[in-house]
Structure formats: C-alpha cells, structure tokens
Amino acid sequence: MKIKFIISNIATLLLCTNCFPQENRNNETAEDKKVRQDKIIQEHVYDCADKINYNFWMKQYQDCLDAGIKKDSTIAYLWQQKAMPYYKVRKYSVGKEYLDKAVFYNEKRWLSYRGFMKCIFAKDYKGAIEDMDLYIKKYGNHYEMDHTCAFYIGLSYLQLNEFSKAEKTFETDINEQIKQRKEAHFLDWFYHGISLLEQQKFERAIASFDEALTVYTNFSEAQYYKSIAKAALGHSEDEIQFLFTEAIENRKKGYTITEDNAVYEIYPYQLRK
C-alpha cells in the first residue's frame, strides 16, 4: 500500500509538472509568446535543421524539428519545415501530413503555400484549386512563390484539361496585374497562350507568347509553342523551322522556365533538354 501511495504521488507530481508550462503559456502576452517561439525556431531550425543536409541525413534533420515541436507543437513553421524536404524528395504523402498541421496552426500563412505544393509538387490539381479558392475568399489574391493564387488556379485548370477555365483565369489575373503593377508576369502570358493553343485559338496564342517573349526574349518554351501555332496557321516552313530551331537551341542553353523550384519538378509544358 505504501509503495502504491508513493507511485501515485510521483505520477501526480509528473502530471502537475507538465501542466505548469501550459498554464504559464495561457497567461503570456502575444509579445512574450512571439519571443518564446522565435527562440525555439532559432534553436531548432536556424541553429540545427538548417545546418543538416536532409538529402543525406533526413532523420537528423527531422530530429532537430521534433525537439522544437516537443517544446511547442503549435508553431506552424516547424511543421512546414518538416514537410518541405519530403516534397523535395518526392515523398508527397509524408510531407502532406506535416503541411496540413502547419495550415491548421496558421492558415493565413500556409494555406496558399499548401496550394502551391499541391499544384507544382504533388500534382493534386483539384486540391490546389480548393486551397487557392479558399485563400482568395478569406484573405485575397495573395502572392505565393512570386505568383498569385489565381495563377496556380489557372495552371491547375490547364493540367485538368479545363482549357476555357484556364484561359479566363489567366486573363483575369493578367488584367489585375497590369492594373496594379503596370505589367503581368511572363509566365501568366505563356500559360495563357498555352490555354489558347489547346483550344486551337492560334492567332491569340501567338499574341500571348509574344507578350511573354517581350519580357523574356530567349524563352525557349514560348518560342517552341509559338512555332506550333504558326505551323497550324500555315506559316512558311522556313519561318517555322527557324523559330523551332531557335527554341531548341535556347533550351539547350538553359533559357527555360526560371522558377526556383524547377530544379525539383518539371513545370507544365516545360521542354526537356
């Protein structure tokens, strides 16, 4: 009986010990919380995980983050950092579990990022549209990885063969960018051109490819698909051959889609070397 009493007291003490930090957190100010969480991020991301090459030492990388999560599992950035390398090594289902946690704890910051990962990495185009649509409704047409949420919606429609929806989405996004920034991103013009090409609207497709080439003059994909549109319209063989050859040469020289994440994934309609 005495032993049971001692064990019971020890268990109660352990439970209470674990409760005190949570009570303290409930009383902390927003500023104190930020300071505490920033310290955890510094220790377990910048001073630990970031110093490890996850391509070789994934367990050690994840251990750094897990130690931080044990201190505070509500820090969304720790969950995002756990997810990110799994997407980059194409273990999308593993990464998704952690990225969902990041969205749960900070939807405004990570929902559009999840939509981006679904579109470019996991190829979950319907899921990408859902995430980006929800983000736009709640927070506006935010930029994620240099592009608007609408851009990824248009790209997802393109990959789902819903070309008319893709065309309209890119068109609206281009007009909004011109209104706000005086110009649109060359990839919006390029993919707008692709959506038109897929619908055999060849003259309009060429016009959009030309807009992309105005910004990025050696853009091999724009040249390549422009040559296809010209062939469909019956342009001269010499003109088509010149443009096609120039596109192939520029692709060999590396004048392709310039997105940072193109080192991990082939982008839609990107030419292979």
Regions found by a protein language model. Give the residues of each.
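Terminal, low-structured helical/coil segments at or just beyond the last alpha-helical repeat
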Residues: 25-29, 232-273
